[in-house]
Amino acid sequence: MLQIPFGWYVVDYSDELKVGDVKAVRYFAQDQVLFRTESGEVSMLDAYCPHLGAHLGHGGIVSGECIECPFHAWRWKTDGKIGEIPYAKNIPPRAKETKIFTYPTVERNNLIYAWYHPHGDEPHYEVETYPEITDPEWGDDFEKFEYRIKCHIQDMAENAVDAAHFMYVHGVASYPEFEVTYEDQKRFFYQKADMITPKGTVKGKISGASNGPGDNFTRFE
């Protein structure tokens, strides 16, 4: 079994998946196709057409509310079920019974999240909303940074709660005072983190929330 904890994970930025866009992506050690229909709905399916195995993300196009296979133009709906076979008067019963695996998706915080569970369970919780991201007073021209790091996701989580290294690695003035609380899958932390700068020590605070393994937000004051 793939050693990835279940939860919501960011798979794209909302503004980078326009109406009609089709992307070949790979998450959770699987190939997927991510697309936005003509009505604006986002869907992420397993990548391969059940008909003859063509990759829907390479040459596939959006047709209305479906993604059209590049091989025989079979059209698959956002729920993974067959929508249309253009050259067939009737859809064969076997095709009607076929369903491409669909990842639950949600758009929030100007991001596209997909739900992963190793056994295909439906989402156990909701994605959080972080008001600063869509608040006009904070602006809408956010910088985006992406890093590819070769480590297990558990290493990232453990680093976040390792307050002892802050003073030696990040320049915190002293060992930070911190508090951690839990609520179901959510983890909240608050800590004082005075920073040493060329102009002297600056008092600071860091607070954050982890809503499962792939939905995290940190505030610096």
Spans of model-derived segments:
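Hydrophobic, proline/glycine-rich low-complexity stretches
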Residues: 1-7
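Well-ordered beta-strand positions in beta-sheet-rich domains
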Residues: 8, 102, 144-146
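Rieske [2Fe-2S] iron-sulfur-binding domain
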Residues: 12-133
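C-terminal catalytic domain of Rieske-type non-heme iron oxygenases
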Residues: 41, 120-221
